[in-house]
Amino acid sequence: MKKNGKILFLITTLILLTALIVSNTVFKKGTYSQTNYYLDTVNEVSLINIRKKQADKLLPEVDKIILDINNEMSLQLPGSELSKINKNAGIKAVKVSDDIFNVIEKSVYYSKLTNGEFDIAVGPLTSLWNIGNKNARVPSESEIKNVLPLVNYKNIVLNKAERTVYLKEKGMKLDLGGIAKGFCADKIASYLKNNGVKDAIINLGGNIYVLGKNDRNKDFSVGIQDPAKDSSSPMANIKVSNKSIVTSGIYERYLEKDGKIYHHMLNPKTGYPFDNNLNSVTIVSDKSIDGDALSTSIYGLGLKEGFEKIKSIKGVDAIFITKDSKVYITDGLKNNFELLNNKYHLANWP
């Protein structure tokens, strides 16, 4: 009997230990991530200080949000809502989902705000250059001249009541590459908040949104990319919480021809890449859709006009890095910006 009692005790102990291990595994909080490739980029979403069971439920839904937006706003998918709008340019209005209507409406707002430096009707130009793809090339001057009249956000007609989009001219083509990721990041952040997630990192191909605190319960330290082509290290970092950080730089995608670099940020007014003294512009904002639209357009405005424009927009800050290694930051970042590379130096705005 004593022997049987010992065996029973050992079995009971093992059951309790197993239950404890399983319980710790199920209820222990940690960081769980998911990676995918949509919107022409690598996306990674990390949920912090969360139970695995909850992460397993939420991450597939996050993946679906990104996939749905990709299917609505992709230029490459013939059946996307964006492709349908473009195919019907000059023909008829197209009824669209709330998501793409809201993105286009916001795009037109930023086109007006920046006097056309940001223009989603830039599609004929981006298709001509195709920078970032295998068949990228430098178009002839006549080719650019022929498509420039089609690049005009003022020819986008929105009917809010009917939820329709109409492009007035045949050959017009919208390209949402400069704003779709920002919209997507905001939608993911909203979904996570509504489902009880307090801390997370959303990284959509460099469009970063940080929610709450990091795994040490502190503000996130987000690195600012060094624009130098031979560098993989950040040149600075900023400490932020519940913010979007979006950078547009000439180092991201470019075409090199006959020793000349042509970066991917095209001026909708000239048809050629923006030409100024900036290497990159980083926008820090509450909403990622704002940062996405502003990063390119503020770059296009150049240092002086861009800096003044940012100062006039409430709740938005920026980091400007010039080609001569000067760094300008707006007032809202002065207490949480750290320079890491002595090649660069902070300059005071006049």
Place the predicted regions along the sequence by residue.
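Mature catalytic core of soluble alpha/beta enzymes
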Residues: 2-350
